[in-house]
Swiss-Prot record:
Described function: Na(+)/H(+) antiporter that extrudes sodium in exchange for external protons.
Gene Ontology biological process: regulation of pH
Protein name in UniProt: Na(+)/H(+) antiporter NhaA
Source taxon at top rank: Bacteria
Single GO term (MF): sodium:proton antiporter activity
Record-linked Pfam families: Na_H_antiport_1
Organism: Bartonella tribocorum (strain CIP 105476 / IBS 506)
Sequence similarity: Belongs to the NhaA Na(+)/H(+) (TC 2.A.33) antiporter family.
Length: 453
């Protein structure tokens, strides 16, 4: 019996370590399943916006929500709370994903990261150029960034539908490319869609960043404590004129990638807990059992880096809550007053659709081909040009980020609806072609070792 007890500690530590190492697998599964939820949310929004409940749908998202504290009043409509507040949490998780990939993922080794970096740049430039060509004379070039984004959830969702016969390297490259795409999207939003910059806001945001660094310096590990500096950064960015949701990226990129230092080593905590459980009288002493279990949970928590722990906790909320709510709030485009025969609307729709459906795969495979042929990088094992083309099609699913950018690019409701329709059509075509081509790819590459997910 004592031998069994003595083996529990290393087994426990092993399980904790395995949980940390399999984080990317959990990420892939959550994102893949959330794609279905996102699709249902978007479809529901379209149905509501084009039904007898359209007015109710529209008025609901303009319902004011806020609170009063003495003479201080804070009130915004639900649409603002979703797009500017809830999406901050989405960007927080995105920032943590970027932080982890740079530290220990595919982006940690520059040689390994060259291919997805080059592919992502090509996948941003070509769609932007295509949109620019169609809309240059119409004066709607401000929407050039709409077809440049990739929706990780939808892309991985389609990849999941193809089953386990997809090479693992294809998963990794698509994920890395999408994360780099997120980095580029964040930079685009910060530098091209921020107006009337107020320097005083930078001081406020800088104060929030300084507070984060101070908290980390004195060893505060509780994530709840960082809500205050996060809110200060958010408010500072809004005052500055930069989209406030980018505060999430800043906070995510600052999240520690190493376990927080504790006075007692995590393994010592687990060892002490096991000693308590091994005591003779512990079997019937609920207080001692409870104390031991608390020590175990504390030890387990101390072994996992904050960036991994917080990301794991937030992912289900973002994947199954925030992103579907965002889709339901913003995908509701009414076709009643939309006139596709209008030159302005048509060119916006056409530019976005072709940018996503054609520009994304064209840019990704062209940039990758040039990089490989020039000797800058090489294709990973199990990877073929057919696989790169599949990644290109899936990267054309822009949905969430593309809609987000379109709302920053267009203030006119007619032009905004045109951009959203372009996003929905372009993303839908990319998903269908990607799925169909994916099955062809699997049949033609039966001998290539596949993912073991």
């Amino acid at each position: 019996m004592s031998d069994l007890s003595s083996n529990r500690l290393p087994n426990r530590a092993s399980r904790v370590t395995n949980q940390a190492l399999s984080a990317i697998e959990r990420f892939l599964h959550i994102e893949a399943l959330s794609g279905i939820v996102l699709l249902l949310a978007a479809a529901s929004a379209l149905i509501f916006a084009n039904s007898q409940y359209a007015a109710l749908y529209e008025s609901f998202w303009h319902t004011p929500l806020g609170f009063n504290l003495g003479h201080f009043t804070l009130s915004w409509d639900l649409h603002f709370w979703v797009n500017d507040a809830l999406m901050t949490i989405f960007f927080l998780v995105a920032g943590m994903e970027i932080r982890r990939e740079i530290h220990e993922g595919a982006l940690a080794d520059f040689k390994q990261a060259i291919l997805p970096i080059v592919a992502a740049i090509g996948g941003v430039c070509v769609p932007a150029i295509i949109y620019f060509i169609f809309n240059f004379n119409e004066g709607h070039i401000h929407g050039w960034a709409v077809p440049t984004a990739t929706d990780i959830a939808f892309a991985l969702g389609i990849l999941a539908l193809l089953g386990k016969k997809i090479p693992s390297n294809l998963h990794i490259i698509l994920l890395s490319l999408a994360i780099i795409d997120d980095i580029i999207a964040v930079l685009i939003i910060a530098f091209f869609y921020s107006t009337n910059i107020d320097p005083s806001g930078l001081l406020i945001a800088g104060g929030g960043i300084a507070l984060v660094l101070f908290f980390q310096w004195i060893g505060l590990a509780s994530a709840w404590l960082y809500i205050l500096p996060g809110a200060i950064i958010w408010w500072g960015l809004m005052v500055t004129g930069v989209h406030p949701s980018l505060a999430g990226v800043i906070l995510g990129m600052m999240t520690p990638v190493f376990p927080t230092r504790t006075l007692v080593a995590p393994l010592t905590m687990l060892s002490n807990a096991m000693q308590i459980l091994q005591e003779k009288n512990t079997k019937t002493d609920l207080h001692h059992i409870s104390t031991a279990l608390k020590k175990m949970r504390k030890g387990q928590r101390a072994m996992i880096a904050p960036v991994t722990r917080i990301q794991k906790a937030l992912h289900p909320w973002v994947a199954y809550g925030i992103m579907p709510v965002f889709a339901f709030a913003n995908a509701g485009v009414s076709f009643a007053n939309f006139d596709l025969s209008s030159g302005k609307s048509f060119l916006i729709v056409f530019g976005v659709v072709i940018g996503l459906f054609v520009g994304k795969p064209l840019g990704i495979i062209t940039a990758s081909y040039l990089a490989v042929k020039s000797g800058l990088c090489r294709l990973p094992p199990q990877m073929t040009w057919a696989g790169i083309l599949l990644i290109g099609f899936l990267a054309g699913i822009g949905f969430t980020m593309s809609i987000f950018v379109s709302m920053l690019a267009f203030k006119d409701i007619i032009l905004l609806d045109a951009a959203k329709i372009g996003v929905l059509c372009g993303s839908g075509l990319s998903a269908l072609i990607g799925l169909g081509y994916g099955f062809i790819y699997i049949k033609r590459n039966k001998d290539i070792p596949h993912s073991s997910e």
